A protein has these predicted regions:
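Alpha/beta-hydrolase-fold catalytic nucleophile elbow
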Residues: 34, 186-190, 258
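Serine-hydrolase catalytic core
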Residues: 141, 174-181, 195-198, 203-308, ...
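Catalytic active-site module of serine/aspartate enzymes centered on a nucleophile-bearing elbow/loop
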Residues: 313-357
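Domain-level recognition of soluble alpha/beta enzyme cores
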Residues: 1-2
Length: 357
C-alpha cells in the first residue's frame, strides 16, 4: 500500500517521518511533498540534511541543478509583517515554513495556494508509477492500485478536496484521468471546513489575525469585520472543503475523520456556525461517530473523537497524553491495511476515545 501524506500549515514534508516509521513497519510506503510556500526551513532539525539549498550532507545541486529551491523561497514573515530573508546562521522561531500560505493582504493568493495544493497532489498521484519504476535502490515497487491519503490539519483540509477532485476527474473522463490512481481511502485528521471561520475562531490563529485587521481599522464586532469575513470566505470557497465534503461522502471512498476534543488550532465546531470546523466536515460527509471497537467505514464515513491529546497528537505526543499518538496512528494503520473495512478504534487508548452516542 501507498500513503500520500499531506502536512499541516507551517510544517513541511519531513513531518511525515513521525508517521512514516509506523506505516513502514507494516510495509506501507509513504510519500510526501511540500505544500505551496512551505519547505524545510532554517529552524528545522532536518535543515542541515534535507534543505535542498543548504544541506551539508547531500549535494542536491548535482541531483537537480543549481536552480532547485525550497518552496518557501527562503522568505519568512518578519517582525513587522513584511517579507524577510530566512536566517540560516542563527535561526529563530520566526524562521519557519509556510508563513505566507494564508495571506490576508491578498485573499486571492490564499485561494490559489489551496487550489495549487490540490493540483500538486494530483500531479504527485499521477507520478507514483514513474516513481515506482525508478526503483533506484531495488527495494521493490509501489502498489499504485492501493493509494490512501492521510492529511493532518491543513493537510486534512487540502486532502479532502484533493480526494474529491481526483475521483471526480477519473469518473468524468477516463482518458483525462488515465494517470490518476483511484484513492482507496482518506484519513482527515484534525481538519475542518470553512477556513475563514476556522481561523477566526481558532485560539491559536484568531488573536494574530484580529490584531492585524484591527491595525488596519477593521475591528471585531463591527460591520466591516463581518464584511471582511464574508469576502474572505467567498474568495477562498473554491478551495475549501465546505464545498466538496458533501460530494466526498457520496463517492464511495472510505473516510475516517479524527477529532481531538478541545482542539486549540482547528475548532471542533460551534452551534452558531454549523459549517465550521471538524464537526462540520463530519456532518457534511454524513459521517457516523464510532467509539472503541472495530469500525467498518467502507460505506459511510467514520468519525472518531479523542478526549485527550492535542492538535498535533497524530504525529507527536502532545497535551500530556502520549498514548493518544499511539492510538491515532493505530487507527490510521488499520484503516490503510483494511481499506477502511476494519478500523481498530481504542486498541491503544480506549479510555481516551469518546463513546458513540
Amino acid at each position: 500500500p501507498v500513503v500520500m501524506y499531506v502536512h499541516g500549515i507551517t510544517s513541511d514534508r519531513t513531518s511525515v517521518m513521525a508517521l512514516g516509521h509506523t506505516l513502514a513497519s507494516k510495509c506501507v510506503a509513504t510519500v510526501a511533498i511540500d505544500l505551496p510556500v512551505h519547505g524545510v526551513p532554517a529552524n528545522s532539525n532536518f535543515a542541515a540534511a534535507l534543505n535542498v539549498e543548504n544541506s551539508a550532507l547531500i549535494d542536491f545541486s548535482a541531483l537537480y541543478g543549481e536552480d532547485f529551491h525550497e518552496r518557501h523561497f527562503n522568505v519568512v514573515q518578519g517582525a513587522t509583517g513584511n517579507p524577510a530573508l530566512m536566517n540560516f546562521d542563527n535561526p529563530t522561531a520566526q524562521d519557519g515554513s509556510g508563513a505566507w500560505f494564508i495571506n490576508l493582504a491578498n485573499l486571492g493568493n490564499t485561494r490559489d495556494n489551496l487550489r495549487q495544493s490540490v493540483m500538486d497532489l494530483m500531479n504527485l498521484n499521477a507520478s507514483l508509477q514513474a516513481i515506482s519504476d525508478l526503483d533506484i535502490a531495488t527495494n521493490g515497487t509501489l502498489d499504485t492500485d492501493n493509494v490512501t491519503v492521510v492529511g493532518a490539519s491543513l493537510g486534512a483540509i487540502v486532502g479532502s478536496v484533493f480526494t474529491t477532485v481526483n475521483q471526480i476527474a477519473i469518473g468524468n473522463d477516463m482518458s483525462f484521468g488515465s494517470n490518476l490512481n483511484p484513492i482507496k481511502g482518506l484519513v482527515a485528521s484534525v481538519g475542518g471546513t470553512q477556513l475563514t471561520q476556522i481561523l477566526n475562531n481558532s485560539p491559536t490563529f484568531a488573536p494574530r489575525i484580529q490584531a492585524g485587521l484591527a491595525a488596519n481599522g477593521v475591528n471585531v464586532g463591527t460591520s466591516n469585520y463581518e464584511r471582511f469575513l464574508y469576502a474572505a470566505q467567498s474568495t477562498v470557497a473554491s478551495g475549501d472543503p465546505v464545498n466538496f465534503a458533501e460530494t466526498l461522502g457520496t463517492l464511495g471512498v472510505p473516510v475516517l475523520i479524527q477529532q481531538v476534543n478541545g482542539d486549540a488550532v482547528v475548532p471542533n465546531g460551534d452551534p452558531a456556525l454549523p459549517l465550521m470546523g471538524t464537526e462540520a466536515l463530519a456532518s457534511l460527509t454524513g459521517a457516523t461517530q464510532f467509539g472503541p471497537g472495530a469500525a467498518n467505514v467502507t460505506s459511510t464515513p467514520g468519525y472518531v473523537k479523542m478526549t485527550a491529546g492535542g492538535h498535533g497528537s497524530l504525529l507527536t505526543p502532545s497535551g500530556g497524553a502520549p498514548q493518544v499518538t499511539a492510538e491515532m496512528q493505530a487507527q490510521v494503520v488499520s484503516f490503510v491495511l483494511s481499506s477502511g473495512a476494519q478500523v481498530g478504534i481504542g486498541t491503544q487508548a480506549p479510555g481516551d476515545v469518546e463513546a458513540a452516542p
